[in-house]
Amino acid sequence: MTKKYLKVDVVSPLGSVFKGEADMVSLRGSAGEMGIVYGHTELLSTLPAGVVNVRKGQHTDVLYVSGGIVEVTPTRVTIMVDDMERAENLNQAEAEKARARAKEVLKNPDASKLDIEAANKRLKEADARLKALNSSNGLYYSKDD
């Protein structure tokens, strides 16, 4: 029997940013962690900023996504995002600086509600970048200090 793979497509406003096949796609959706394999039931979910793992055999592509929507059919996973980066292209120092800057805004008692919302978003994105970077290196990253 021939092995059946999921078709995986990550698209941004710029077009397709990742195409591949997978034994399994793992990600965090609105209802929590999901592992998606060939034959999965159809679903549509929102995604927070986070990590998407696309595994085929012994190889795993680790992707940072800025958040978006995932559509699953029995044979395909389509992820629509504003931004996506492969973990190996992420810069740890930049992500740590972004995290520190966001935390500084959150500590400021004079920060506006708009500044606080933007800082919370940037903090979640920086945490997701660090998690993607560290998980691609076989490390565990916790956003808690």
Curated annotation (Swiss-Prot):
Lineage of the organism: Bacteria, Pseudomonadati, Pseudomonadota, Gammaproteobacteria, Thiotrichales
GO terms for MF: ATP binding; proton-transporting ATP synthase activity, rotational mechanism
Name of this protein: ATP synthase epsilon chain
PANTHER family: ATP SYNTHASE DELTA/EPSILON CHAIN (PTHR13822), ATP SYNTHASE EPSILON CHAIN, CHLOROPLASTIC (PTHR13822:SF10)
Membrane topology: Peripheral membrane protein
Function: Produces ATP from ADP in the presence of a proton gradient across the membrane.
Compartment list: Cell inner membrane
Keyword match Cell inner membrane: yes
Subunit structure, interactors included: F-type ATPases have 2 components, CF(1) - the catalytic core - and CF(0) - the membrane proton channel. CF(1) has five subunits: alpha(3), beta(3), gamma(1), delta(1), epsilon(1). CF(0) has three main subunits: a, b and c.
Source species, domain of life: Bacteria
Pfam families: ATP-synt_DE_N
InterPro entries, sorted: ATP_synth_F1_dsu/esu, ATP_synth_F1_dsu/esu_N, ATPsynth_dsu/esu_N
Entry's family note: Belongs to the ATPase epsilon chain family.
Gene3D superfamilies from the UniProt entry: F0F1 ATP synthase delta/epsilon subunit, N-terminal (2.60.15.10)
Record's keyword terms, sorted: ATP synthesis, Cell inner membrane, Cell membrane, CF(1), Hydrogen ion transport, Ion transport, Membrane, Transport
Keyword Membrane part of the UniProt annotation: yes
One cellular-component annotation, GO: plasma membrane
Major location category of this protein: membrane
